[in-house]
Amino acid sequence: VDYILGEYLSHPDRTELHEAFSSFKDKRYRYVRCDQLLHDSETNEVYLSPWLKDKKDGHPEFYQRLTDLLKNCGIEPKELKCTRDYWARDYMPVQLSENEFLKYQYYPDYLMKSKNPEDAETRTECANVLRGMGISCRSTKLIIDGGNMVPCGPYVVMTDKVFTENGKEKGDEMFKAELESELGHPVIIIPWKMHGDFNARDTDKYGHSDGFVKWCGGNSILMGNHGDQYPEEAA
């Protein structure tokens, strides 16, 4: 028991566990692992959507430069199937450890609530892509955007847009506990605010934490200087 409990960052004491055992199925216990997430430098395969090389909607020159660079590094990139846009990070499962992937519900408002009906048509159904890939995933019913999950050591950094995407008030502690329970790691929430018209193409309506933070190892992170554009929010 001590060995199992030692795998978690926090847990009720043994007495509380025994007392609550009879109603265990009806309770949500938040056991959060303290081991590190799998980071980019520890992975060994790169998958790209073929949309990235599409001459009309993609960026074929960038695709060629990127794949050449990967091959020069001894990495043979692989292509995904059944994708509808090239932002694979946003809709593909998040890799939590060597053999653990989590598939989430990808229904971003910037696609599903856009006034342009073509935007919703670009939503990729992850289940279709996963067929034949040989990847075993567990699933969550929570609505998450892959671009809004940045692994930082044992933590996952997300903007507070994840609350509104799931119909919750920002700061809802019960929802945050559920989110951490599904991810199996503690979540750090950073604030985000949309500026401009939702339907304008140049408006940042995405709320992605990967545009704010990058883990550099240890206790170091690289952050964009948000105060350059919105000094009133950087106080």
Stretch-by-stretch model annotation:
Residues 1-235:
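The feature marks the mature, well-folded catalytic cores of soluble enzymes
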